[in-house]
Curated annotation (Swiss-Prot):
Stated name of the protein: Cytochrome c oxidase subunit 2
NCBIfam families: CoxB
Major place of residence: mitochondrion
UniProt topology in membrane: Multi-pass membrane protein
Note on cofactor: Binds a dinuclear copper A center per subunit.
Positions with a binding annotation for Cu cation A2: C196, E198, C200, H204
Example GO molecular function: cytochrome-c oxidase activity
Intervals, Mitochondrial matrix compartment: 49-62
Binding positions (Mg(2+)): E198
Family: Belongs to the cytochrome c oxidase subunit 2 family.
Length: 239
């Protein structure tokens, strides 16, 4: 959800997002120090009464302003590389779900331990309850166990979409005919919202993503409920 004045990042709900916030703060500190140094140098040069018009080169200062920026780039690049590899790290996931983008909704499949499939459509304004988020609520949420390593397979059935949940630090393109994967781990219980982040047609703005992180025992109960509903639906179709 939006932060005060919409200036800060969302509260982290996953280890990856926490690392992204740390990296953001690290880079911002470096940028602020560089900016202050440049403004200070400009102020000193402008206000100085001493001008030497015949200075053509200075080997020492040229060496300094070559070496120092190189060191700064290394200081910025090393945490960036660490974070880049961390986002791609996927070690023995305990649960795998598949997310398929359609015009203009998402469908999900839980195929590891359960045979659960459902579509997730945005709730129209007339169906919202008090306190629901406008243009972000869906009829079927993605329910995941907290503190569990989850692999998400992302693809699309028609055009390119993008499966994005900012609070979890997730963004992956959904490309027709291709399976992309990302690692997900919710570090706290809560409801986290996202949207399709790739323009995909007229109703691109109406493809929300809602992830509900719950304790493991609650997740198991939800799976049993979904299986019962699917079994009941199959019986009704046979009749």
């Amino acid at each position: 959800m939006a932060t005060p004045a919409q200036l800060g990042l969302m509260d982290a709900a996953s280890p990856v997002m926490e690392e992204m916030i740390y990296f953001h703060d690290h880079v911002m500190l470096v940028l602020i120090l560089i900016t202050c140094l440049i403004f200070y140098s400009m102020l000193v040069l402008i206000s100085s009464k001493y001008i030497y018009r015949f200075l053509t080169d200075g080997h020492v200062i040229e060496t300094v302003w070559t070496v120092i920026p190189a060191i700064i780039l290394v200081v910025v690049a090393l945490p960036s590389l660490k974070l880049l590899y961390l986002t791609d790290e996927l070690d023995n996931p305990q649960l795998t779900i598949k997310s398929v983008g359609h015009q203009w909704y998402w469908s999900y499949e839980y195929t590891d331990y359960y045979d659960i499939e459902f579509d997730s459509y945005m709730l129209p304004l007339g169906d919202l309850s008090k306190g629901d988020a406008r243009l972000l609520e869906v009829d079927n949420r993605v329910v995941l166990p907290v503190d569990t390593s989850v692999r998400v397979l992302v693809t699309a059935a028609d055009v390119i979409h993008s499966w994005t949940v900012p609070s979890l630090g997730l963004k992956m393109d959904a490309v027709p005919g291709r399976l992309n994967q990302l690692a997900l781990q919710c570090s706290r219980v809560g409801t986290f919202y996202g949207q399709c982040s790739e323009i995909c047609g007229a109703n691109h703005s109406f493809m929300p993503i809602v992830i509900e992180a719950v304790p493991v025992e609650v997740f198991e109960g939800w799976c049993d409920m979904m299986l019962d509903e699917e079994s009941l639906g199959s019986l009704n179709m046979k009749r």
